[in-house]
């Protein structure tokens, strides 16, 4: 996978040379290049921003600089967008369209990720990604989909963000443009968000993890996603706190059931919206019993609280 990152602080991404992502680069699984957006400026101050049209606080990143950079990295010739090819500049419409498209994609199970990652066809079409706190939330499903791409290009915004016409223009050129939020909060720039998305995406690549099965039971993973059960290691009794006896029983069926029940209970407490999204037809008898004890009705298509 080829990964390009555009930022006014490219040195921020030196951290990507550490840990598993650094090893993945050494093995040739991923090629990461961080570019300085100021390299595409032409003024003495290397300016990348200007005041907002219509007034307001802060500065907005200029489309001229971004377009020269992105045209070069995407191997595109500059052009003028016509009315026929113009896409809406309404951010709500764009977000709704993106969310609808994401919702239409079926979630891939964790087992399929681990077992069939080598057989999933990759796409040669580059994907241009901008972090944006006003965009749809980046999810594990998005990470799974993007892990099948051959080329990802991330643009890191700063100040009040980037000119809204930048993603608009490249969508009109047929580029697959994604805008994602990583949570209901605002950062100083897109670098942190890009690092988060990169780690979520690249760890799903075949050969990235030492044990591919380790991603199977993680939180948010799979078709009927739950939060992961709690994890313990040795010693079994630490400072007076003991691990649950069932985990020491050696009975794998009981251990699996305990962990499943704990995942259901934890998800019920912290993320009941994930319980509501479960497919009741894929719950076994023990799942149903646990959910009913937690106050859920499981006779319909999806659980609902009593």
Swiss-Prot record:
<dbReference type="GO" id="GO:0002939">
    <property type="term" value="P:tRNA N1-guanine methylation"/>
</dbReference>
<feature type="binding site">
    <location>
        <begin position="182"/>
        <end position="187"/>
    </location>
    <ligand>
        <name>S-adenosyl-L-methionine</name>
    </ligand>
</feature>
<dbReference type="InterPro" id="IPR002649">
    <property type="entry name" value="tRNA_m1G_MeTrfase_TrmD"/>
</dbReference>
<dbReference type="Pfam" id="PF01746">
    <property type="entry name" value="tRNA_m1G_MT"/>
</dbReference>
<dbReference type="InterPro" id="IPR016009">
    <property type="entry name" value="tRNA_MeTrfase_TRMD/TRM10"/>
</dbReference>
<comment type="subunit">
    <text>Homodimer.</text>
</comment>
<comment type="function">
    <text>Specifically methylates guanosine-37 in various tRNAs.</text>
</comment>
<keyword id="KW-0963">Cytoplasm</keyword>
<feature type="binding site">
    <location>
        <position position="157"/>
    </location>
    <ligand>
        <name>S-adenosyl-L-methionine</name>
    </ligand>
</feature>
<dbReference type="InterPro" id="IPR029028">
    <property type="entry name" value="Alpha/beta_knot_MTases"/>
</dbReference>
<keyword id="KW-0489">Methyltransferase</keyword>
<comment type="similarity">
    <text>Belongs to the RNA methyltransferase TrmD family.</text>
</comment>
<keyword id="KW-0819">tRNA processing</keyword>
<dbReference type="InterPro" id="IPR023148">
    <property type="entry name" value="tRNA_m1G_MeTrfase_C_sf"/>
</dbReference>
<protein>
    <recommendedName>
        <fullName>tRNA (guanine-N(1)-)-methyltransferase</fullName>
        <ecNumber>2.1.1.228</ecNumber>
    </recommendedName>
</protein>
<dbReference type="GO" id="GO:0005829">
    <property type="term" value="C:cytosol"/>
</dbReference>
<keyword id="KW-0949">S-adenosyl-L-methionine</keyword>
<keyword id="KW-0808">Transferase</keyword>
<dbReference type="InterPro" id="IPR029026">
    <property type="entry name" value="tRNA_m1G_MTases_N"/>
</dbReference>
<dbReference type="GO" id="GO:0052906">
    <property type="term" value="F:tRNA (guanine(37)-N1)-methyltransferase activity"/>
</dbReference>
């Amino acid at each position: 996978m080829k990964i390009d990152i555009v930022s006014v602080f490219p040195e921020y991404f030196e951290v990507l040379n550490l840990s598993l992502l650094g090893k993945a680069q050494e093995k040739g699984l991923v090629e990461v290049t961080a570019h300085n957006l100021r390299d595409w400026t032409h003024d003495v101050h290397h300016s990348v921003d200007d005041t907002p049209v219509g007034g307001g606080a802060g500065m907005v990143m200029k489309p001229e600089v971004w377009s020269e950079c992105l045209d070069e990295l995407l191997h595109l010739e500059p052009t003028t967008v016509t009315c026929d090819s113009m896409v809406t500049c309404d951010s709500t419409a764009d977000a709704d369209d993106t969310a609808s498209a994401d919702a239409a994609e079926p979630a891939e199970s964790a087992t399929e990720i681990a077992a069939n990652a080598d057989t999933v066809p990759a796409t040669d079409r580059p994907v241009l990604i901008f972090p944006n706190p006003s965009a749809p939330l980046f999810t594990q499903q998005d990470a799974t989909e993007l892990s099948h791409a051959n080329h990802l290009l991330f643009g890191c915004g700063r100040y009040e963000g980037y000119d809204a016409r930048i993603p608009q223009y490249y969508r009109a050129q047929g580029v697959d443009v994604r805008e994602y939020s990583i949570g209901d909060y605002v950062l100083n720039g897109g670098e942190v968000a890009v690092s988060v998305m990169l780690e979520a995406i690249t760890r799903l690549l075949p050969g990235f993890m030492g044990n591919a099965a380790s991603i199977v039971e993680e939180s948010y993973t799979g078709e009927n996603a739950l939060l992961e059960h709690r994890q313990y290691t040795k010693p079994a009794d630490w400072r007076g706190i003991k691990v649950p006896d069932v985990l020491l029983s050696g009975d794998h069926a009981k251990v699996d059931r305990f962990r499943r029940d704990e995942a259901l209970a934890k998800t019920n407490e912290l993320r009941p919206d994930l319980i509501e999204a479960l497919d009741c037809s894929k719950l076994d008898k023990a799942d149903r019993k646990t959910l009913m004890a937690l106050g859920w009705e499981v006779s319909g298509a999806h659980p609902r609280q009593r």
